[in-house]
């Protein structure tokens, strides 16, 4: 069965045959059967489904999915419509307001970004309910490193937004032709130590315009 439905399939199909992925898959089947795991198994690869390889302009790298009920749906930092924005996302919206004057929306569903070429990728694609980082060591990093490496091989520059140490650890995979924006994580624990005031959204758009590309419309409308 073909797991990925767009141009990511050609780039990543060999990964699904690798021994590490077979082990990861077995582990996940058991986990989904016996525990509460987020996101829903049909949403695991949504970041890749919502934003095709060819369309990627910006990557926002997260850590692992939200681990509360009804939050995670496969896009980093995003929550399903109708679910209150978690604290990190509230801080992202505050910075977006101060950076570009965008109104803070009444929800945290970031599909509009994904549809414009913002790949919202977590480094681990699943998590146990209530246990942050619980799937960090089961093989996802190997898979998501391949995703980052595939983008890095593009001559066409991509903006990589790396918030926090986990995301910044991936910098070594990213080629020098790409534009990297770094700061501390938007979590309430660190946002005041350099996330607020870092202006990642205007920096990303300025770079895209300098490359002759359409900037991202970061404003999320109310629903």
Curated annotation (Swiss-Prot):
The active site is at residue 64. InterPro entries: UDG_fam1 (IPR002043), Ura-DNA_Glyclase_AS (IPR018085), Uracil-DNA_glycosylase-like (IPR005122), Uracil-DNA_glycosylase-like_sf (IPR036895). SUPFAM superfamilies: Uracil-DNA glycosylase-like (SSF52141). GO terms for cellular component: cytoplasm. One of its GO terms (molecular function) is uracil DNA N-glycosylase activity. Its EC number is 3.2.2.27. It is found in: Cytoplasm. It catalyses: Hydrolyzes single-stranded DNA or mismatched double-stranded DNA and polynucleotides, releasing free uracil. It holds the Pfam family UDG. It comes from the Bacteria. One of its GO terms (biological process) is base-excision repair, AP site formation via deaminated base removal. PROSITE patterns: U_DNA_GLYCOSYLASE (PS00130). Excises uracil residues from the DNA which can arise as a result of misincorporation of dUMP residues by DNA polymerase or due to deamination of cytosine. Belongs to the uracil-DNA glycosylase (UDG) superfamily. UNG family. This is Uracil-DNA glycosylase. It comes from Desulfitobacterium hafniense (strain Y51). The gene is ung.
């Amino acid at each position: 069965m073909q797991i990925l439905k767009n141009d990511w399939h050609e780039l990543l199909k060999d990964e699904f045959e690798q021994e590490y992925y077979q082990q990861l898959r077995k582990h996940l089947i058991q986990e989904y059967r016996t525990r509460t795991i987020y996101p829903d198994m049909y949403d695991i690869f949504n970041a890749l489904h919502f934003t095709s390889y060819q369309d990627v302009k910006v990557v926002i790298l997260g850590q692992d999915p939200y681990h509360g009920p009804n939050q995670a749906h496969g896009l980093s930092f995003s929550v399903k419509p109708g679910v209150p924005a978690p604290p990190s996302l509230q801080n992202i919206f505050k910075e977006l307001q101060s950076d570009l004057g965008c109104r803070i929306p009444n929800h945290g569903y970031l599909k509009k970004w994904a549809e414009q070429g913002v790949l919202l990728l977590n480094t681990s694609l699943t998590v146990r309910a209530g246990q942050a980082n619980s799937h960090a060591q089961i093989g996802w990093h190997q898979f998501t490193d391949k995703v980052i490496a595939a983008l890095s091989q593009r001559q066409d520059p991509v903006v990589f937004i790396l918030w926090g140490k986990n995301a910044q650890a991936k910098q070594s995979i990213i080629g020098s032709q790409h534009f990297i924006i770094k700061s501390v994580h938007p979590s309430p624990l660190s946002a005041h130590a350099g996330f607020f005031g870092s202006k990642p959204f205007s920096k990303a758009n300025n770079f895209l315009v300098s490359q002759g590309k359409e900037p991202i419309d970061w404003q999320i409308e109310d629903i």
